[in-house]
Every structure is written in C-alpha cells, then in structure tokens.
C-alpha cells in the first residue's frame, strides 16, 4: 500500500507499438515515463527520483572543480542568435529551434542550447581578467524540433540536459580546466555505473576547436564509433581519421609513355599496369567560361 501511494507506477502489461528499443520499452512498461506526444514525455514520480539522484552526482563533481550552478531562461530573443549569426542556421530549413513571435511581432526561440545567453550575461558581468576563470552550469530543459523523434528519451523534442560554460583569459588557462572537466565527466559516469568510451567528435553547429564525447556502447543507438584494438584511439565515425597508406616507391628508373585505353579510373590504371595508387598523380584541368 505504501509503495502504491508513494510511487504510483502505472505499469503497462503490453509493449507499446512505438517503442523500438529495449530502453524505451522498459521505461514505458515500468511506469517511468508516459508519452504525451511525439518526442514529448512526462517524467513519472519514480523517473523524477532517478533524475534527482543523477543531478546530485553531477552537482557534486562540478562543485568540486568550482563551477557555479545557475538557471538560464528557456525563451531566447532572436537578437542574441542573430548577433552570433546562428539564427538562420537554427530556424530556417531543417533547423532544430522552435521559434515564435510575441504580440509585438518580436522573434524568440525555445532554447536548444544556451551559448548566446550565457555569453551575453558574462560580457556584462566580467570586467577584468582577475575575475577569471569562471564556470557556470545548469540542469535545464532543452527543446529541439527533431525531424523524426525516436527511441524514446534518446531523441526527443523536449529533454533535460546538463550544460556548462567556462570563461578564460587565455588558451593556456583553458587547457588545464578542460582536463578537470573531462575528469569530472569520467567520475560522473563511473558513479552512475556506466562504462564509457571517450571519443573525438565533430563539434557540429555549436562549433569549437575540440570536442570529446563519452559513448556508452550498446546494441541500440544512433552513433557509431571507430577505435583501435589497443584502445589508444577512438572517434565518432563523423570525426574518425585513418593513418595514410604506406607509399610504394616507383620502380621505373626512366620516363615512359603508357597507353591507357578504356582505363577511366585510378583503380583501372593500377590493375592494368601493376601500379599502386600512391605511385600515380592525377591531373584534372577545368575550363571555365566567364561571360561579362
């Protein structure tokens, strides 16, 4: 009786048809979440308890590296995004930002991320390098107009995200803090009982000189990673690079004309003339006609 009163679970006997992966199925059947609309979910009491415990773990690690928690607005004026030249990219075409106009016709967007707002605030409050470094973080609801919401909470239109923003006087000051933040993330995942792989990643629309993602390997997901057997290198498939192929020296000691009839590609030439691709230079000439 007490369990029912404290945690009204609302479990399901059958698996909902829209649940494609096991995590989504278990969250729905276990009464952790309830679907409100496509990509929109209600967090039920037992799920909220889980979120609060995870938040406590996150806060402890970030407070240990002197980050300050705050709460930023979810409704952003378009001017801030236009100033950073990201408004069009986030709202036009397949942009992921929900946007609207108020009664006065002013444009706003529902936050998919908070770089613009926190940068605006920091520019007003930081007057000297002596105030640096500074790091702010929040655990806040985000909105993204996903083209195809799927996999439950994995790709939804409304979700909770922890994001942190730090400000530094130089790159030399940033580097050691980046390492501290990386270690904090490792501790967070460890304390949550997750085995992760740190991989190089594409910064995407957010940008940045470097980006690292912590991946949990699973059968279900939307990302793929490539890694070496030794574990010395791992990267998101969008960012992964390979070592250049070993060059094979050209044996011929003198220049020689070679006929290449019906050999339309480098592969054809290599196969018909016992050559390696590293021994060939391809010259392409473009003819441009300019009308004035």
Feature roles, as predicted:
Residues 1-290:
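TRNA-recognition modules of translation machinery and tRNA-sensing kinases, especially anticodon-binding
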């Amino acid at each position: 009786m007490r369990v029912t009163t404290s945690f009204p679970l609302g479990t399901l006997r059958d698996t909902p048809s829209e649940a494609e992966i096991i995590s989504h199925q278990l969250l729905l059947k276990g009464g952790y979440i309830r679907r409100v609309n496509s990509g929109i979910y209600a967090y039920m009491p037992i799920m909220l308890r889980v979120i609060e415990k995870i938040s406590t773990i996150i806060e402890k690690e970030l407070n240990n590296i002197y980050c300050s928690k705050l709460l930023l607005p979810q409704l952003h004026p378009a001017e801030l995004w236009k100033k950073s030249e990201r408004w069009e990219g986030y709202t036009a075409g397949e942009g992921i930002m929900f946007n609207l106009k108020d009664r006065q016709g002013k444009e706003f967007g529902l936050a998919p991320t908070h770089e613009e707002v926190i940068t605006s605030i920091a520019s007003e409050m930081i007057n000297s390098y002596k105030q640096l470094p500074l790091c702010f973080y929040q655990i806040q609801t985000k909105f993204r107009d996903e083209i195809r919401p799927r996999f439950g909470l994995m790709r939804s239109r409304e979700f909770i995200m922890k994001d942190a923003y730090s400000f530094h006087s130089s790159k030399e000051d940033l580097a050691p803090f980046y390492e501290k933040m990386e270690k904090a993330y490792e501790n967070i995942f460890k304390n949550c009982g997750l085995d992760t792989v740190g991989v190089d990643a594409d910064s995407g629309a957010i940008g940045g000189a470097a980006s690292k993602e912590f991946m949990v390997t699973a059968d279900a997901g939307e990302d793929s990673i490539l890694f070496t057997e030794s574990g010395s290198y791992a990267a998101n498939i969008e960012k992964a690079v390979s070592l250049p192929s070993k060059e094979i020296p050209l044996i011929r000691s003198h220049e020689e004309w070679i006929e290449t009839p019906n050999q339309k590609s480098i592969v054809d030439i290599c196969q018909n003339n016992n050559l390696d691709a590293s021994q060939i230079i391809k010259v392409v000439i473009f003819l441009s006609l300019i009308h004035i």
